[in-house]
Amino acid sequence: MLIYYSLGNFQSLQRKEATLLGGMAKVTIKKDFKGARIVDFDMETLVTDYRLGGVRVTDYFDIITTYPWSKYSRAIAESGNIGNGNANFNLDYMFQLQAEQAAQVHEARRKAGLE
């Protein structure tokens, strides 16, 4: 059994630490005469990046981008607004959180015999 869950929107303006990193499920299902089964799964970490544009029309950031972790760099992070105003969410915390997330996926893949 494989379970991915989401308790919110793909992108949000929430300031809670747990909402600033997310993931996109990658699941391979094989279907044949025996039935359907999961033959592979993984997850790509996603980062929500907040920027201020030229004109402020709300109290929120007006440029919000979701990056795959593989395309998110320290330079991008340092030039943006890490944590959307949450002082507890800094660059080091983000890397720690991503490492924990990756370890959970790795352990699930190991238990499934995929690593």
Give names to the regions the model predicted.
Residues 20-115:
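A short C-terminal boundary segment appended to hydrolase-like catalytic domains
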Residues 1-25:
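Conserved beta-sheet core of the metallophosphoesterase superfamily
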